[in-house]
Amino acid sequence: MKSILKKAKHFFHTNETVNGENGGEKTAKESESQQHHQQQQQHDENGANPPDQGVDEASNVSQSQPTTSALQTSTSLQPSSSLHQIPQSQSSLELTTNPTQQLPTTPTKQLPTPPPPQQPHSQQQQQQQQQSQSQLNNNDISISTNTNNTTNNTNNNNNIDSTLTTPVPSSENLATLSTSTTSEQQPNSQPTPNNTNTTTSPPPSSASTSNLSTSTTTTTTTTTTTTAAANENTNTTQEQTVSPNKPPQPPNALSQSTTSSSTSSTSLLSSTFSKFKIKLGSGSTKNKDSSSAPGTPHINNNNNTVSSSNKNRSTLVITPGSVNNNNNNQNNHKNNNTTPDHPPEEQKPVEKEVITIATLADFPEDCQKLIRISGIPEEKLIKNIQILAYVLHFRTGRFFKLVDEPPREPRKKFVSERFNDGEKLLEPVEPALLKKMYKDSDQVGKGGFGTVYFAKSTKEKRLVAIKKMPHVTKRQQQQNFREAAILAKCDHPNIVKLHTCHIDKDSNLWIVMEFMEGGTFEEAAKAWKFNENNLAYVAKELLKGLQYLHENHMVHRDLKSANIMMSVEGKVKLIDFGLCEDVATSTPMHMVGSPFWMAPEMIQQKYHSTPVDIWSFAISLLEMANQRPPMMESAVKAMFTVATDGATGFDDPALWSDCFKDFLSLCLKQDPAERATAEELLKHPFIKKADSRDNMENILKKIFLTNSLMNSGF
């Protein structure tokens, strides 16, 4: 009898646990319980095993023996029934969801339930939830988004990259969750969120905390984060990359627990921004499903400057001043490497610095040094300070203006229409084939406008001279084509002949000209002491070439010994027409050329024309007679003296005849209008003293063959 009463007592205790508050059905259940006790008593008397199942028709609940460690309950309740959470010592009622699926944003309607028993850590969990909610409400949210500013874009799919960054609480076990989202936006419509491959849960509430809990594990034990981890994550932003096939890993402070209580802050953030696709990682990490539209503006939170990008991803960063994200922003800026999607505005030309001069002491120190080296008397410099300013401008590139200088009329830019077709001279040849067309190239000279080589043309089976010049900028192209066009129009035995033009792979223009075996007038003057007959021969050849140029309204403007070629055959020709000017429709004024051969009117920055070539021609003859240019010790002194006093003359006048002196005096008149022309000089008696060509061939062969042997090491 005692055993029967003990079992009955246990039965009533179990029935109360299952049915809870259904007290209205107690009477019917007691009658059924008596019948059940009788069956068990009969079973005990017979010594058989207890039945497998006891069916409670009122509750329809399956039960097992009381000694079972876990009570697994499968319920099919009436609308008035409710579930009671079983104490933790017995079992756990778990709702396991696939972490790759998204929970519905609207929770299902739950049946009324009594408050569940408190878990050991429930009070701590509620405190964490309240603190996290207050932190999220009080702290600003830094939103970093990639968007296309063009609202009238005709594309139907415009990708928007967004980065959602929550500020890090300074005293809680929270970590910054950096979220990058991608959504498709239709024109003039709201963005449609993409599928989310993350486990999210709506914000917990007092009525449905236990029913809406989701977990990726099989236990409900809550793990607590350490204070050290929270402190470490306070000043840093941790970012993780989410694989399309794997659920995202939470930050360090949240990675130890994925239950509802430990992920309360994550659930709040996920539910608030559930319409975004979460992609944890740096701003520079690319995703197949997300791409920023070209030309996306970039605002740096440090200085709020705006830029845009065509190639790289850019982000729109709006950071409140209360959150310190300088390090993260700097890293994002480095990763983005944004470049403008439109060419930068052309830089305005830098205004030239003009130095006002009243006395010699007003010149800068570098100019003062050049003045001291020249050795020009101070009284002469003060008297001609304007000329000194012109000379120093040519030598240093600085601009000077006298205090009492009268205003000058602006310079006119003249563009000749006769020599603007040099591009037509280009021969259509692949740049890679140029080395095959011209073999055995060897450098023979180098100047300010390019480098000269001689080579063998495989096509023409002859030696040629090739002048290579940089051909990149617009100004270089204009000057190079201009020189080629002038040479193409010149057809004279005393002017070097043009063959063709090419452009190589390094953007250099090749001007292919006739090859002259020999050297320059400068080299010959240093190697040989010429007499008047030799000089008369050279003067006659040069004057014929100058006469041809001047009659065709062209001025060389850079005539000097280095631009005069002499061959072993006795030929004398003008080369290097890079500064040649068309004076048929213009009168140039600016200062160009070489300082020792420059005419006075050019140094004085006056309008000049063909007489400047006559002056330079005479200085070249003086160089040949003296075996050096006049006043070689100082370019400033040479230019200043020429502009004020004129040329100096012979080093040893006694060695030269009056005929030669008279010839040079006609060429070196200070006033260009009084200077003799090339046609007049060809009629001068000095020209009649010219040596024969055969004799000049022998002299030039001795000069240049000796130089060749010396250069070859023999």
UniProtKB/Swiss-Prot annotation:
> What's the name of the protein?
Probable serine/threonine-protein kinase mkcB
Q: Which SMART domains match?
A: S_TKc (SM00220)
Q: Region entry Disordered: which residue ranges?
A: 1-267, 281-349
Task: Outline the extent of the Protein kinase domain.
Answer: 438-687
Q: Does the keyword Cytoplasm apply?
A: no
List the expressing tissues: Expressed at equal levels in prestalk and prespore cells.
Q: What is its EC number?
A: 2.7.11.1
Species this protein is from: Dictyostelium discoideum (Social amoeba)
- Keyword ATP-binding in record: yes
Q: Which CDD domains match?
A: PKc_STE
